[in-house]
Structures are given as structure tokens and as C-alpha cells.
Amino acid sequence: MDRCLIFLVLILMGCNSSQNDQASTTVHETPEVTDTMRYQDEFHLKNVRMLTQGGDNAEAYWSFDSRMLVFQSTFEKWGTQCDQIFYFNPLEDDAIKHRPKMISTGLGRTTCAYFMPGDTTVVYASTHLGDEACPPRPERRDDGKYVWPIYADFDIFVTDLEGNILKQLTQEPGYDAEATVSPQGDKIVFTSMRSGDLELYTMNVDGSEVTQVTNELGYDGGAFFSPDGSQLIFRSSRPKSEDEIKVYRELLAEGLVMPTEMELYICNADGSDLRQLTELGKANWCPFFHPSGDKVIFASNHETERGFPFNLYLINTDGTGLEQVTHDDTFDAFPMFSPDGKYLVFGSNRYNGGTRDTNLFMTEWVD
């Protein structure tokens, strides 16, 4: 999944505005801001710390023991021309002064890395078997539509922390990526084109028992398990009208999707009891369950007219209690709580010196 939803993309998406019927309802007293990287009214954040400085860093996910982060980065200073996978210990390592350990091959493009049970291996997707070069980005379209590429060469692999690929989990033709692991350590959820559409699937951590979870037309992706492993939260852009369906299918035939409208959906891990969680309009994406399992944190630009900023929000799993968490004027996204519930990590454009750099930030979480 191409994740560079920043600045130009935000402007393009801002042309499609909608009304928000899920109003924020939570009220807090205003404390004095003492954290230098925390903005006013960010009540849930404490001791915000920048973990990287420079490049495009995102999708940082915690190890099971809440001590390590694995993430993807494009940063010329680190020798990467397109996303590669790195890991480090944010409690001890300084990723600003020293490049973290790269555990992908350095070939092709990678995405969506996640620790496996035991924290000695990582699952991620890569295009390197199809082509060792970085795959080309889509050219600007005559119709002006912003699109994401769905690279057919993406397959899912397991690597150790030295960068040795131990196993290839998917071998079907077409896109297989966006893998995340259940907190119970038994299942992986991922997005695949094997049915002819972008649907969610689960499999055992050894790649066996692949089971289709969703089956409605549209791009279902970015899925995560609930803390007890019983539910999935994901984002989807599901076309409704004949024209929307026609455009979706035409783009998909070109290996492209247009993520201008995305809402959050929740279901049981087997796909049952599927329901739409948000009806906010615009782009609502990268959801992750709160440690309680009763709320979801996600990124959204639904309150904007021009498509940005993106900020983080909380919502109850019954669709009530929408609350804004961050108050950035640019871009906050890719949130993940540590398994022990102490920390939140996210990607942001805050304090990037006016560049387009996206850096990782870590904060203590305050309920």
C-alpha cells in the first residue's frame, strides 16, 4: 500500500467534503502544556518524544513485549530509495543519531512489517521477487484522480532480526500485503487480490488455513485484531453507485485504487457481524484498538475543508463518543498502542522544519 497521504494528496482529497453527524462529545479541562512536542488540548499524550528525524518513516508497530518497534522508511541518508524495514528499541536506542537495524533485503519495495510471537521474527510484504528495483510510482493521471498503486509483486515473508528470510507465506498471483498479527499470537490478517478484488483474509502464523473474511466490492485493508483476537477493525473504500463501481473496477484492472473516501468497519475475526463504524466522510483510516478493546483510535481529515490536516481520533466500538486526540495542523496518522498499554506510537509531520518529512513519535498514554 502506498501510504504517502501528505500535502498534495490532502489537498486533492479536500475537494470532496461531507457533513459529520458523529460529533465529538468528550470534554476535558485544559492543562498547561509542558511537553515541547505536545500541542495544546492533547490531553491523552504525555512526554511526547521524536524517535526519527528525516525521511519518510511510518507504520511503526510494537513487539509483543512492548520494547521494540518495527517500521518502514524511505530515507536517502540511510541508503533507501523506497521503503525498507527497520527495527530498534525506542526505550534505549537513538534512531536519530544511529541508523536502526535494517531487516528487509534492501531490494524492491516493502511495507507493513509486524512482530511475530516471541519477538524474534517479523512478517512483512516485499516486491523483491518480482523485481529487485523500486517499483515505479503511478504517473499523474489526465483525469486528475489521486491513486494508490497495488503492486502485484507484493508477497508476505517472515524474516529473523538479522534479515534472513525464513519463509514465504503467500505465493498466489497478485497483491498480498498489509499483514498484522493477533495479540493472541495465532493468526495473521492480510489483504489479498486472489479473489479478483481486494479482500481481507486470515491465516495461521505458519501460513496455513487461509480463510476469506470479507467479500464485498471495494478495497478492504489496514486491518488489526482486537486485544483478545476476537474482532477486526479495518478501513474500506466501497463504491456504491454505478459510476463509482465502474471507476473502481477500471482502476483495479490497472493495479490502482482511489482512496478518496474511506470509512472504518468492524467485524468478528471470521467476518461475521460486519458493520460500518464511522460515517464521517473523507478519509478515515489506519485504525487500531484501544487496549480496553472498547474504543478505536484512527486518523481522519473529516473536519477539514481543504483535505488537511489529518489528526488522531478515538471512537467507541458502538460508534459513539467521537473524540479528537491530536491537534496538529499538518499530519498525524499510523497510531498503535503498546501491548502493555503504556505508550502510543504514531507518524507525524509535526516539528519537521517545514519539510515533508514524516517522523515517528512516541508518547506515554493518558486515559
Language-model segments: residues:
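C-terminal motif of bacterial Sec signal peptides marking the signal peptidase cleavage site
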Residues: 12-14
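Bacterial signal peptide processing site
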Residues: 16-18
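Multi-bladed beta-propeller domains
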Residues: 33-56, 88-109, 159-175, 204-219, ...
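Beta-strand-rich domains and repeat architectures in extracellular enzymes and scaffolds
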Residues: 35-38, 47-81
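A flexible loop/linker signature enriched in serine peptidases of the S9 family
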Residues: 53-56, 73-85, 104-110, 125-155, ...
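Residue-level detector of Asp-centered blade-edge/turn motifs that repeat once per structural unit
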Residues: 64-65, 117-118, 183-184, 227-228, ...
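Hydrophobic beta-strand positions that form the internal "hydrophobic ladder"
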Residues: 69-70, 122, 188, 232, ...
